[in-house]
Amino acid sequence: LKKYIVVGAGILGASAAYHLAKAGAQVTVIDRKDKGQATDAAAGIVCPWLSQRRNKAWYQMVKGGARYYPELIKKLEDDGETETGYSKVGAISLHKDPEKLEKMAERAAKRREDAPEIGEINILSPEETQSLFPPLSSEYGSVHVSGGARVNGRAIRLALVRAAKKNGTTFIEENAVSLVQDKKRITGVHVNKQVIEANQVIITGGAWSQELLSPLGINFSVRPQKAQIIHLHLENTDTSSWPVVMPPNNQYILSFEEGRVVVGATHEDDVGFDLRVTAGGVHEILSKALEVAPGLDESTMVETRVGFRPFTPGFLPVIGPIQGYEGLIVANGLGASGLTSGPFLGLELANLAMGKETELELQLYSPENAME
């Protein structure tokens, strides 16, 4: 029986562990529960098809991520996990300019040819838009995509962790101190004064991954980008089926059950692992959110979450073995699309580790791209 160690149990590590365990492998997950885990703070909008980002490798990854969700949710339900935080509530992308909405709808229709999961695409008037998400300003029309979904990062991660445990995965809440090395082969991990051995060590430590790789002389340049995300509450309002909202600025608004509305997020570079909720961050989020959805001005501020998104220098995730070493795989840099692509990349990572075929052309995501 092959043994695998996964270091870091955010969305990516939790998914990799689950898929390895489902395939019958022996899996140990090591996670030290740092504050500021990106997955824990994040509220995911699963609607990659309207993006104007031109990078084809990135789009293939997020498209695969969105497509895989319903299948994964079914697998988790078969494992008795129904609290996944995922719901296909549809998405609306807002704009004041009708021409921009036309172009957006055209882009979605073109992409639907190889992504039927997009579902129905409709251009909605400001009135129709507001009827779907009542707090919105009446200035915005929208493109509605029925296949859009939301996901609660904390809930999907915990569902994957519980399901991985049911399939025999061992979880250790400790710091993975260092990798065990035999010449150029990685054979395990030092944890809590003991050694855990494995055929493959998979590092999915997000913004913290460099710590394990530095002692090997590997300069893995993944940096944290700080996100602050605000949770609001609307009294006596059923928000459970409202669509996710993508305004024309770089923010998002989405609702969950029981009146909870999430608005975010900041994109703060070069502040390191600063966990503070800042006046400027809250001001930026709320001023942008209330401009788009003035009906939220009477909502209660419940909490502000902070997470550190891992980014590579080229902003494209990396996944693969580290050249010059055997038994060592890294996957990282999911950035702001981790909840869209993470579960799918975890499946790809499990297949890669087991020597099975992957769906993506993984050479496009070589870890060399994040080496300095």
Task: List where the protein language model places each region.
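Short loop/edge segments at beta-strand edges and connector loops
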Residues: 31, 125-126, 172-175, 303-305
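Dinucleotide-binding Rossmann-like beta1-alpha1 core, especially the glycine-rich loop
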Residues: 45-128, 132, 288-290
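Short beta-strand to alpha-helix junction loop
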Residues: 60-64, 96-103, 143-162, 276-281, ...
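C-terminal catalytic lobe of FAD-dependent flavoproteins
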Residues: 293-372
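Beta1/beta-strand and adjacent pyrophosphate-binding region of the FAD-binding site
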Residues: 1-10
